[in-house]
Amino acid sequence: MPATNILANLFVTLYNTEARRRGDCQVYPTSKLGVEVLGTLKKAGYIGEFEHVEDSRGGKFSVHLLAKITKCGAISPRFKVKKGEYTFWEQQYLPSYDRGMLVVTTNQGVMSHHEAAERGIGGFLIGYVY
């Protein structure tokens, strides 16, 4: 059965593979947003290298895990966040102030909420990881 929410499928696959203490995982299918989210997670140090493998069924990601994800998930519906409202959403989704990050999509691309607050821009919440 095809995945209806590709981003939620990506986060669930990462979380389940981390919970099983595996080093690598395969995520099907792929999307451009998934590439940007994985790039953000890699830049933050939650995952290692990842590779997009194109096949005839929507492609797949091959992701190397670093055993640094305790919990992650997609945020649905995608809530709109103004530039000064990140602390409210941190309290909703993250366990403490300095632990973890919210993944935000903005008009300047996908980034962490720390980077978006530093730039002074808002966007839509699409996921969290800690």
Curated annotation (Swiss-Prot):
Family matches, as Pfam families: Ribosomal_S8
Annotated SUPFAM superfamilies: Ribosomal protein S8
A GO MF label: structural constituent of ribosome
Superkingdom: Archaea
Any one Gene Ontology BP term: translation
Entry coiled-coil feature ranges: none
Entry GO terms, CC: ribonucleoprotein complex; ribosome
Key words, A-Z: Ribonucleoprotein, Ribosomal protein, RNA-binding, rRNA-binding
Xref: PROSITE patterns: RIBOSOMAL_S8
rRNA-binding among keywords: yes
PANTHER family cross-referenced by the UniProt entry: 40S RIBOSOMAL PROTEIN S15A (PTHR11758)
UniProt-listed NCBIfam families: PRK04034.1
Assembly description: Part of the 30S ribosomal subunit.
HAMAP family hit by this protein: Ribosomal_uS8_A
Family: Belongs to the universal ribosomal protein uS8 family.
Function statement: One of the primary rRNA binding proteins, it binds directly to 16S rRNA central domain where it helps coordinate assembly of the platform of the 30S subunit.
UniProt name for this protein: Small ribosomal subunit protein uS8
